[in-house]
Amino acid sequence: MAVQNTLPDPNNKINAAGEIDSNGSAGPGFSSVSLTSQQPITVNRSNSGLAFRSISKFQKFSVDIKYNKLTKAEFNVVYPYLMERQASLEAFFVELPQYGNTSAGSKEITADASAGTNQLTLANTTNINVADLFSVTVPSDDTHVKVYKVTKINNNVITVSPQIQRPIDVSNSGTETANFSTPKMRVIVSGPDIQYSVDVTGLYSFSVKLEETLS
């Protein structure tokens, strides 16, 4: 069986060996997910007061996940998974159903897109909405793990933010797709602490902060 590289949740089960297993333990669902876009900028001002702005670093998303009160069994599915990846600095994926659009599903990308462009041409844009979050699947490039937001829709062309991180060549073997139904973000644990508490009834209170990473 393959190693489970997605944070365990009701759709991504894990067994005691850390593998994907449909008969394994389901992770708890999220009570809330906060998504933040971080785009550092530099602002310089002239003596006359004019402001000159420039992007100083790459854009990334951060994710703040909160859980409802957890039983010990539920807690012990997700917490060891996160601890192991915090200690090893290993990246993993988190599935974000709250930001998915199951009606849109997956759409084939039908035209090449160069790195730095902000547009993608799809087979159709049926049921896609402005502000939808999506990831892409490029069979010839498994390092394209960035997620994007739709900012405009014009016929079969969507405008996205941030700009496309890696080139997409549709002439290569396989089908390049934009995945709207259950976008997955590649992340690492943010910061040095993963804190939890246990109340008098034995229920666990727990949340975790993650940040997007491309490596």
Regions found by a protein language model. Give the residues of each.
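Extracellular/virion structural assembly segments
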Residues: 1-215
